[in-house]
Amino acid sequence: MKNRFRLNLFRFVLLLSVCVSCSQEYDKALEDALNLAGENRPELEKVLRHYHGDTLKLEAAKFLIRNMPGHYSFADTMEVKPYYDEVDSVLTTMKGCNVWTIRDSLVKIDNKYADLSPEWVEDIQIIKADFLIQNIDSAFVQWKKRAWARHLDFEQFCEYLLPYKAEELQPLDAWRTYLREFHPDHLDELRYCDQLKNSSLQSAITLNDNLWYYMRPELTEASQVRPIYRLSTRLRMPFGICADFTNMAISVFRSQGIPVALDFTPQWAFRSLGHTWNVVLVNNGKNVPFSGATSNPGQPHKPDERMAKVFRITYAVNPDLKRLSEIEAFVPRAFRYPFFKDVTEEYMDCEDVEIEVGDSLDGRYAYLTVFDNTEWKPVDFALIKGSKVVFRKVGMNSVYLPVCYEAGGQMKAIGHPFLHTYDKEVRPFIPDTSRRVTLKLLRKYPVLRHVQGVVMRLDSGEFHASNDARFREYEMLYRVTDCSVTGREVVLPDTLGAFRYWRYYQPKNGSYCNIADIRFYERATGKQCVGKIIGTDGCWEGNPGHTKDKAFDGDLLTFFDAPVSSEAWTGMDFGKPVDIGRFVFTGRGDGNSIDIGDWYELLYWKEGGWHSAGKRKAETVHLLYEDMPRGALYWLRDLSKGKEERIFSYEDGKQVWW
């Protein structure tokens, strides 16, 4: 009994010491924040005194104050007010106008304020007690008395409802109050359904439907004007990038007491750019993705997009990110903001990746990067211990390059690029100069979803030759059965003979004879033959200008779009019979097939950098690179035009995109 008593006493003392230690650490974090407040410290102490008798609200206040350093606002909101007011004026006078006409007017205003650069200041130095108290009280009402957040525990409440703003530089105003009156259509009706009255999922769907109906937003890939942080103005903007609408949605949803956060991937693993979206914390404890004002919770949200990492924006500081900034001389921009956490495993199967980097980097930070079409972009970081670095929860079936950064910001590879396979293996790309291969390259970029649909209009198309202008009799030269989004070269037999009229004919319904490029070459000289363009007149009314001549203008981004769904055609009358030895054609697509006349350069990764395998001009619809090392990672660049380019490997005679 004595031994058991001593053991229990020891456990109690140990637990007490841990609690005291944690309390002291929390108090230290709070005191550090109060010290950073400077002359604004009395405002924050007033908040703490106000909640002295309410333990839970006091903890909420401490949470906000502890994590406030690093959150920023404009030092003087009056500096940006004239800009916001002019935007409001345009949105009022141009209500009902075409969204792109509105955009052009707003771009002019943006140019007028090109020199606007207001100073930033940390919230801890300017926030007022009354504002913070009102925010805390309002958030608690939404948590405890509204219908859609009662399932949250205190920690969840602190992140999903409590924060006094949704993003940096958002004005410190009474947004909860004025947004609460914004189109709460049908939300109150949920109280009449016992199944749905407490459903955060259904409330989010209902409110998001209202947002879409009110805003009808047009998504753009790039910002058209400087960010607008005043919510009353932002709610009226008819266009923007995904981050504009997701950040706005957080404030609108939280004003109604619906627990919503923002998730993002800093860089797609398979193409350029990154993406942001929302999540709602539903009653079963799961986060359900959606996109504010554009797609609802429960609808598939980019399910086939390959991601390397996913993070969630938080109000609380991430100690790992804070430590990173304290240790490293240079931190890439993606990781300078310390308010997000890793949630990759909520979205995909992922595994840790261990890499040997050598002893000389012990104690440094390494980064995992993915390719964004032009350069490697960091998506994760980890501390190097000894000669190894372990990256946690990494997405699979994607190519990565481990790097570190020099003090001046120069990126340096610390290993080979590698594929993280579905089998959870790390497969490095190492050029094998003892084993060589000839590369036949057909494209510089993978075929994405929006391209696949239109290229199928090439299916069943036919090439004919005839000496009859009406093609009552003709030779069938070629029938399209493979709808790959590449150019095709067709070599004709010597026995074919000469014909005056040559055409592409599309019998299939729904094809509209879509074709981007056709070129005929004389057998004897090998030169391109040009004649009078003949075929179906006109074009589809929804695509003016896309007449039959577009198939012969040498531009892969223009195409013939016939006025009839089937049995249209386009071709050439050479004025006399011509012996054509070959022809090439490219279907409607994205312009990323090999384009005759363009200059290209093939690069491959070797010894920490890209090495050139040579530049050449495309003479046909493919490029041949002979005597190339096997097992390398390649990158084909179009030096003449375009931006879309992608890394690939070469396997079984084909380009495999990463």
Predicted regions and their residues:
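Bacterial Sec-dependent N-terminal signal peptides
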Residues: 1-28
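Hydrophobic/aromatic-rich core segments of domains that either
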Residues: 26-38, 50-53, 193-210, 219-232, ...
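Secondary-structure boundary elements
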Residues: 46, 57-237
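A short, amphipathic beta-strand motif
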Residues: 350-359, 444
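Short, acidic Ser/Thr/Gly-rich low-complexity loop/linker segments typical of extracellular
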Residues: 374-387, 616-618
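Short Pro-Gly-centered beta-turn/loop motif in secreted/extracellular proteins
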Residues: 388-401, 405-408, 496, 626-630
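Structured interaction patches on ligand/partner-binding surfaces of diverse proteins
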Residues: 407-434, 520, 646-658
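Aromatic, loop-rich ligand-recognition surfaces of beta-strand-rich domains
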Residues: 436-475, 482-658
